[in-house]
Amino acid sequence: MSKADELRLLREAIKNFPDALAVWSRDGQLVACSDAYARLAAAAPISEAAEYQSADGRWLRRSVRALDDGGRIELLADISDLRRAEQASRFVAYHDSLTGLPNRRLLDDRLRQAIRLAQRRDRMVATLLVHLDDFGRVNDTLGDGAADTVLREVAERLTRCVRKADTLARAAVDEFALVVCDLKDAADCRVVAEKVTQALAPEFRVGGRTLRLKASIGVSLFPADGGDGEALLRSADAARYRARQLRR
């Protein structure tokens, strides 16, 4: 077989290679590429990054190997499934499985971010703890399934009380936390607290029954009530406890 035939067969093999593969000369000229690579290159320029998202939404990992003659082989591997698995794993690690809200781990991180932003902009951060005082009774009377339904409904109602920039998290079994960012006036926090009270006031319908929940709310403000997230949560919890005692 002549060298010309060998080269033709090699080009044909590369052209039909199932993955995105390209062979480059040492002076940067494209020698041959697979159809998969050609389709990617036609849709958008190939990125020099090790990993990137293509025009069609796929995540690609780019690897390059040097050839003895100074050229190189470039391979693009589709890692979309791996990326989705990583994203799902991160979501599980940072979110409550029942309500889909941020969990305590993510709440702590969001608080740190909110405080850093407030320090740069000379603003306040409000932390509200909402405790469902008689949730244990719901659980004991109606069972776990009904209790879960109530918690999901509480989460939906509270979601309507915050802005996109704010955070609503499930801080404990029967407790939710709201982080309200970038406040100019402490009065804005009272507005949010009133929204929460109004959101939880209507009856909950579960399994053909109706019930009302009593909730106690505690509020703390950065920087007046604490300089970090842990201090703000402690202060809000103390305020919540005082509010509950006063109501009795």
What are these regions (language model features)?
Residues 23, 30, 120, 127-129:
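Core hydrophobic beta-sheet residues of small sensory/regulatory alpha/beta domains
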Residues 3-29, 35:
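Sensory modules in modular signal-transduction proteins
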Residues 90, 100-126, 133-163, 169-173, ...:
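Conserved long alpha-helical elements within nucleotide-processing catalytic cores of c-di-GMP signaling
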Residues 168, 195, 199, 205, ...:
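Cyclic nucleotide signaling catalytic output domains
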Residues 27-38, 132, 238:
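PAS/LOV sensory domain surfaces, especially short acidic/polar patches at coil-to-helix junctions
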Residues 12-15, 59-97, 104-116, 166-167:
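Signal-transducing coiled-coil linker helices
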